[in-house]
Amino acid sequence: ENTSARAVLKALHGNAAFVRASRTRWTLADREVFAYGGIAQELKNRVADAGGRVSVRALLDDMLDAFPDIKESSIRTYLATLAFVVEGGTVRCRRPEDPWPVIPSLNTVRGASHRSDGCVRITIPVTTQVLRGSGLFVEPPVAQAIGVAPGLSRDFETAHGPVPVAWDPAEPAAPNMGSVRQLAHAVDAELGDLLVLIFDPVVGTLRADGVEGKITG
């Protein structure tokens, strides 16, 4: 009987007899191996163990030695997130007193604008990911304009249920939002269209306003 990789992973995650040892490796829990916490957490652990600051090169070498199934480019991607501060070849974790980087204004994002009623309008390409219901990247100026700063999350109510928008400082794909598939279907959006979304940051709502070229409202 064929067993999918997804089914195997689901079984491993739900079995206390096994522990994740790296991105792709699992081992028996009774071997007393530290559980792999993901790239961001492993980086934070190593920075803390080094006294709060460590050479970027030394950190990379340590991670690659401990987790040979992780690429250096992936580690560097996480080091470039807001969770870390790289200074002169060394890295430390961002502190509460560290200011966030300056975020560009909303008008730097193509298709995004403030409306006179206080809402924020954006357009997103209707891709296979949108139609499949995948989560989507949100441009930082958009997240800021709708009230989602780094480290925060917010649910926007729609006619089809809430759509979360979150900005995890340790997540390379952040800020991001949940599925808008139902919003796209509601206005008959098709692959290749530009879906118009309207956020109301005051009341916390989100709606689709048609597709560009055939706006409905």
Residue ranges and their predicted role:
Residues 1-217:
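C-terminal non-catalytic scaffold/interaction domains in large multidomain proteins
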